[in-house]
Design a protein with these regions (language model features):
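N-terminal metal-binding scaffold of metallo-dependent hydrolase/deaminase domains
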Residues: 1-36, 369
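Conserved, mostly hydrophobic/aromatic
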Residues: 57, 126, 182, 212, ...
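Divalent metal-dependent hydrolysis catalytic cores, especially in the metallo-beta-lactamase
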Residues: 59, 74-103, 119-132, 159-171, ...
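His/Asp/Glu-enriched, well-ordered alpha-helical/loop segment
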Residues: 232-241, 247, 259-271, 276-360
Length: 371
C-alpha cells in the first residue's frame, strides 16, 4: 500500500504532503512524492493521519466484555479497530479467581492467535483484586483480597506473563513490597480504587508504581491540607495519570488541570469503556451488575458511575475541546498510553512501526481506519 498526501503526525508534529509506503503490515518508507509499484494507492488529499490509538484501560465494547472470555476479546479486537484503535489492554474487573482466570485465558488465547483484522492485544490490565473496599466504585468488593503471592497465583492461574498492568491500592497490607515484586517482573503497577494519602502514593512510587488509574475517580480527593492521590500524582514526575475525558467522570477544568500538570508525555487518555460503548442508551451489564446508560452516562442503580461509553475517537476530540492542541491530543491518545505500559512499537508513525492509522478530516472528524 502507498498512502499519499497525508497530514501525518510525525515526531510530535503534523507534517503535510507526507507519503508512506507500507509493506507486510509495517511502515517501510516515509517521505514526499514517493513512488512504488502498488495495487493499492490511497490519496488522503490533505486529510489528517494519526497512528492508531492505544487504549490501556477498556473493559468492553459494543456489547462484549473482557470477563466473558476469548470470543468477547476477539469481538472487541475487531470492532475497536474500526474505531481507529491499533492496540489495547482488555481490562478485567473484580470477580472470583475462577472467572478472573477465565478472562485471562481468553486474553492469552487472542494474543497467541490474533484476529487477522483487529486491534492488537498488548496484554491484560487487571483492575482487581488488590483494591480498597471503601473505594470500590462499580467493582464488586466481595472479591477484594490482600496482595500476597498466594492470592496472585490464585487470580492469575499461570497467566502472569500476559499481565501488562495491574491496578492496586498501595495502602493494603503488604502492598508496597508486592509492588516491588510485580514491577521487577515487568508489570506496570497503577494506583487506583484507593484510600491512600499523598505520602503513601509517593512511597508506592519509590517501590516502582508509576501510573494512576482513572485519576480523581475512586480515590482520595484533592484537598489543600491533604492532597490525596491526585495531589501527589500531579507533582510526582515518576507517575503517569490516566484520565477519562468524557465530560462526565471529570469536569473539563479537571482534565485541563491534569494536562497542564502532567503534560502530554504523562497524561494518559483512556476510555474505561463498558459494553455500551458504541451502542445506544439502554440497560447493560458490568461485572454481573445492571448498568443503566442515559445520555451516554453509565451508572449502577444507585447512581454510581460504572465505566464509560467513550471511544478513543471522542476522547481525542474532547481533549482538543478541553484546550489541548491537536499535537497534544494526538500524543495523549497514542504514544503516551503505549509508553506508559512499556510499549514503544505502537502509537507512533515511524519506519518499522505497525501500519494502522486513524484518518480524520482537517476539521478532525473521523473518516476511517487505514491498515
Amino acid at each position: 500500500m502507498l498512502i499519499k498526501n497525508a497530514k501525518a503526525f510525525l515526531n510530535g508534529s503534523f507534517q503535510e504532503n507526507t507519503d508512506l509506503l507500507i509493506k507486510d503490515g509495517k511502515i517501510a518508507e516515509i517521505g514526499t512524492a514517493l513512488t512504488a509499484e502498488c495495487e493499492n494507492v490511497v490519496d488522503l488529499k490533505g486529510d489528517v493521519l494519526l497512528p492508531g490509538f492505544v487504549d490501556v484501560h477498556i473493559h468492553a465494547f459494543m456489547g462484549k466484555d473482557t470477563m466473558n472470555g476469548e470470543e468477547a476479546v476477539r469481538h472487541m479486537s475487531r470492532e475497536l479497530k474500526k474505531f481507529g484503535v491499533a492496540a489495547f489492554l482488555p481490562t478485567t474487573m473484580s470477580a472470583s479467581p475462577e472467572d478472573t482466570c477465565k478472562a485471562l485465558d481468553g486474553i492469552r488465547a487472542v494474543m497467541e492467535a490474533p484476529e487477522a483484522d483487529g486491534a492488537t492485544v498488548l496484554g491484560a490490565h487487571m483492575e482487581a483484586p488488590f483494591l480498597n473496599e471503601g473505594k470500590a466504585g462499580a467493582q464488586p468488593k466481595q472479591f477484594f483480597v490482600l496482595p500476597t503471592e498466594e492470592n496472585w497465583q490464585r487470580y492469575t492461574g499461570g497467566n502472569e506473563p500476559i499481565v501488562r498492568m495491574i491496578t492496586m491500592a498501595p495502602e493494603k497490607e503488604g502492598a508496597l513490597d508486592f509492588i516491588t515484586r510485580l514491577t521487577n517482573s515487568g508489570i506496570t503497577v497503577s494506583i487506583g480504587h484507593t484510600g491512600a494519602d499523598a505520602e503513601t502514593v509517593h512511597a508506592a512510587a519509590d517501590h516502582g508504581a508509576n501510573h494512576i488509574t482513572h485519576t480523581f475517580n475512586a480515590q482520595t480527593p484533592l484537598n489543600h491540607r491533604s492532597p490525596g492521590v491526585p495531589g501527589a500524582a500531579m507533582v510526582d514526575e515518576r507517575i503517569a495519570c490516566e484520565f477519562i475525558s468524557d465530560g462526565i467522570h471529570l469536569h473539563p477544568d479537571i482534565c485541563r488541570l491534569i494536562m497542564r500538570c502532567k503534560g502530554k508525555e504523562l497524561a494518559v487518555a483512556i476510555t474505561d469503556a463498558m459494553e455500551a460503548a458504541g451502542m445506544p442508551d439502554g440497560k447493560y451489564q458490568l461485572g454481573g451488575q445492571d448498568v443503566f446508560v442515559k445520555e451516554g452516562a453509565a451508572r449502577l442503580e444507585d447512581g454510581t458511575l460504572a465505566g464509560s461509553t467513550l471511544t478513543m475517537i471522542r476522547a481525542f476530540q474532547n481533549l482538543m475541546k478541553f484546550g489541548a492542541t491537536p499535537e497534544e491530543a494526538a500524543t495523549m491518545t497514542t504514544s503516551t498510553p503505549a509508553k506508559s505500559v512499556g510499549n514503544h512499537e505502537y502509537g507512533v508513525i515511524k519506519i518499522g512501526a505497525p501500519a494502522v492509522f486513524a484518518r480524520f478530516t482537517p476539521e478532525y472528524e473521523f473518516v476511517e481506519t487505514i491498515g
